[in-house]
Amino acid sequence: MYSTLERFLNYVTYDTQSTDEATGVPSTPGQMVLAKVLAKELEQLGVRDVVVTENAYVTGTLPSNIADPEKRKKVPAIGFIAHLDTATEVTGKNVKPRVVKGYDGGDVVLNEAEGYVLSPRDFPFLKDCVGMDLVVTDGNTLLGADNKAGIAEIMGALDYLVAHPEVEHGTVKVAFTPDEEVGHLAKLLDIEAFGADFA
């Protein structure tokens, strides 16, 4: 079992920056690359009916483990959706994530050569992060937490449910979609086939 952080640090290394200049979906090839990686990981976790469409939509199902058929019928299928792409404004190529352990409240030097610093003077919310671990870049790229952190959390939850069959759950549906940053999120997702009662 990988930790959520390990998954996240891996996912951000995939360049999935979308572009609004493309006419097709996905708008960039890196999204399909990550889609295939995630599909393989879902299959390794034991998720069923894993599909990657030609448009880089990934779907899968973790079946209910509720033994009582009457009880199982009453539990809705829950869907979790996250997007593969990262923002168009800043590059997602060659992301170099770094973990700052136990943030002390001061400046975090992202890139000494370039003079990039993450400072609580510029980002006052950092004072709420004292003592926490931070994941940062070298300042030359975006990190891609939107939405690769969501993907990592979903994968972590699935991993936990598979590893802990004593935790009863209804059917869990998963979808990873391309091009949210350019307005396509669920545009080509077959909602009926996805089959979640709530997502």
Region locations from a protein language model:
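Acidic/His- and Gly-rich active-site-bordering loop/insert found
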Residues: 2-133
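Acidic/histidine-rich catalytic neighborhood of metal-dependent amide-processing enzymes
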Residues: 127-199
